[in-house]
């Protein structure tokens, strides 16, 4: 792999060795004006991961800038201590890598695979890998096609298409990057990086607000409107939902940020669950066909008998998503008020304690 290859795949062990052999100093990269563009690119990598799109400059790298910006970007993400951003950054980097890997030669793909401990060989437009390597990275891919039983296996070796092998490498990249966020950023480096975090935090907070996510990036079910709570409860009880209810629930969950795999997991509880059909429906509703659908409004929900158990907040909204966002804002205000009350209460207790201490200190015999 050459310098351009290292820039495209900075998460590889080869790229790390290259940086070490060139004697780059992280202190210099973080502080010296000569590396200003590296730091700006690192910030942009993180911002792009929040936006979720791979842009032109992500695919046409300036080798040195691109390579060195990767560890700086990781440090910026780690400093937020935000699990949702860590997952999102790992996913974005893996998607970026996948786009680049699609243009690699067979040899290039096998080189990257080798870095992850995958020994592969190419034959007749297929890649042949050991079944243990296949299972290691296909385990997190829940679509029925990834089951080993649905693959061609000969003498312990799995035969996969070029695209499938590339998809496995994408998953390997995602897992490696996400697992690497356990290490803490050295304390002496934090002040230098802090100025780059303001825009990142602002962008992340905006995304979470738009998608109705809690602080840790999880969907807050407490804020669901009654109709969606009811549909989800039925699904969890093993009750089959009619098509209109499935469409409403799936589009609602996708609109507030739940990923496809998590939605698929919910439907596994249904008695009539079929992996292939459910996967097709979820893919179609969440944008696999080129259009991401918005969940139906309250009038449509009532028309199909899916509006159940209205409450007071329902009187002020005409759409399940409006209910969710209003509920999220209300919960945020309540939490802020509770925190402020706790702070004032603690302050009052401290004041009383201080007065008692003063009085005790002035009393006879002390």
From Swiss-Prot:
One of its GO terms (molecular function) is DNA-directed RNA polymerase activity. GO terms for biological process: DNA replication initiation; DNA replication, synthesis of primer. Its cofactor is [4Fe-4S] cluster. [4Fe-4S] cluster binds at residues 227, 298, 307, 314. Coiled coil: none annotated. Binds 1 [4Fe-4S] cluster. GO terms for cellular component: primosome complex. Keywords: 4Fe-4S, DNA replication, Iron, Iron-sulfur, Metal-binding, Primosome. The keyword Glycoprotein does not apply. It comes from the Archaea. Pfam families: DNA_primase_lrg. InterPro entries: DNA_primase_lsu_euk/arc, DNA_primase_lsu_PriL. Belongs to the eukaryotic-type primase large subunit family. Regulatory subunit of DNA primase, an RNA polymerase that catalyzes the synthesis of short RNA molecules used as primers for DNA polymerase during DNA replication. Stabilizes and modulates the activity of the small subunit, increasing the rate of DNA synthesis, and conferring RNA synthesis capability. The DNA polymerase activity may enable DNA primase to also catalyze primer extension after primer synthesis. May also play a role in DNA repair. Heterodimer of a small subunit (PriS) and a large subunit (PriL). This is DNA primase large subunit PriL. It comes from Methanocella arvoryzae (strain DSM 22066 / NBRC 105507 / MRE50).
């Amino acid at each position: 792999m050459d310098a351009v290859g290292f820039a495209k795949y900075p998460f590889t062990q080869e790229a790390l060795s290259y940086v070490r052999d060139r004697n780059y100093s992280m202190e210099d990269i973080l502080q010296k004006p000569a590396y200003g563009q590296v730091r700006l690119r690192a910030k942009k990598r993180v911002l792009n991961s929040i936006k979720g799109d791979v842009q032109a400059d992500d695919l046409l790298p300036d080798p040195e800038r691109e390579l060195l910006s990767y560890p700086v970007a990781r440090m910026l993400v780690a400093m937020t201590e935000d699990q949702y951003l860590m997952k999102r950054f790992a996913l974005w980097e893996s998607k970026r890598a996948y786009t680049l890997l699609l243009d690699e030669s067979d040899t290039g793909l096998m080189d990257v695979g080798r870095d992850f401990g995958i020994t592969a060989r190419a034959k007749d437009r297929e890649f042949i890998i050991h079944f243990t390597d296949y299972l290691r990275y296909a385990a997190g891919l829940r679509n029925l096609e990834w089951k080993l039983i649905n693959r061609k296996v000969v003498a312990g070796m799995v035969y996969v298409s070029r695209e499938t092998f590339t998809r496995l490498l994408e998953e390997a990249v995602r897992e490696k990057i996400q697992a690497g966020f356990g290490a803490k950023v050295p304390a002496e480096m934090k002040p230098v990086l802090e100025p780059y975090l303001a825009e990142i935090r602002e962008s992340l907070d905006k995304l979470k607000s738009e998608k109705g996510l809690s602080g840790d990036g999880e969907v807050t079910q407490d804020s669901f409107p009654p109709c969606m709570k009811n549909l989800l409860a039925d699904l969890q009880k093993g009750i089959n939902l009619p098509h209109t209810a499935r469409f409403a629930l799936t589009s609602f969950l996708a609109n507030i940020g739940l990923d496809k795999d998590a939605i698929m997991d919910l439907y596994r509880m249904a008695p009539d669950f079929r992996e292939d059909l459910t996967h097709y429906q979820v893919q179609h509703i969440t944008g696999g066909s080129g259009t991401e659908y918005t969940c139906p409004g309250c009038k449509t929900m009532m028309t199909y008998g899916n509006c159940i158990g209205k409450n007071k907040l329902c009187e002020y909204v005409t759409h399940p998503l409006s209910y969710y966002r209003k509920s999220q804002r209300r919960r945020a205000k309540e939490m802020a008020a509770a925190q402020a009350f706790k702070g004032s209460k603690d302050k009052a207790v401290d004041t009383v304690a201080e007065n008692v201490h003063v009085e005790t200190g002035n009393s006879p015999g002390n």
